[in-house]
């Protein structure tokens, strides 16, 4: 199935508002499930921009996905190709490699569904409810459509900050 990326220049308003709170709590060091702070250089301003993102970590590899489509952090990360992630109080500098359609399809089909399946019951329920709420059910049910609509980046270590 082919599809064009969703035109989602901004996340839903409830997400934008909750992101500010989530970012503040993460900066205070409160654990927020798989959420980490992504800081990337702005593609126009060059200034550091931070956003909370969910980090999928399995078998020593790490990915982040643009669950809301082409949001600003996705565009900035594409332009910069690198970022800092704050994980459990440690900041790491990473290279971000965007997956192509075939690799992203495999990520949604194999990696993400297995990752969500290993979450505690509440985590699984939360993930499924969130994807339904933001009209992104295909993330767990249609890997080809998810890959066409939602960018995925693998994060490769470049060093600690």
State what each model feature region is.
Residues 58-60, 90, 160:
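Short strand-connecting beta-turns/loops that link adjacent beta-strands
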Residues 23-24, 50-51, 139-141:
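A generic local structural motif
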Residues 11-12, 68-158:
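Short, structured beta-strand-loop surface elements
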Residues 33-68:
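Short beta-strand segments
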Residues 1-30:
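Extreme N-terminal tail/first-helix region
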């Amino acid at each position: 199935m082919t599809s064009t990326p969703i035109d989602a220049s901004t996340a839903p308003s409830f997400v934008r508002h909750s992101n500010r709170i989530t970012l503040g709590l993460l900066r205070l060091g409160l654990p927020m499930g798989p959420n980490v702070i992504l800081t990337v250089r702005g593609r126009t301003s060059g200034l550091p921009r931070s956003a909370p993102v969910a980090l999928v970590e399995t078998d020593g590899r790490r990915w982040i996905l643009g669950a809301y489509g082409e949001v600003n952090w996705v565009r900035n990360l594409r332009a910069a190709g690198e970022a800092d992630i704050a994980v459990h109080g440690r900041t790491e500098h990473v290279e971000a490699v965007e997956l192509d359609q075939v690799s992203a399809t495999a990520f949604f089909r194999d990696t993400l569904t297995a990752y969500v399946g290993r979450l505690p019951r509440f985590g699984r329920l939360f993930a499924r409810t969130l994807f339904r709420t933001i009209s992104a059910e295909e993330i767990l049910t249609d890997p080809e459509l998810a890959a066409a609509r939602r960018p995925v980046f693998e994060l490769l270590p470049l060093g600690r900050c």
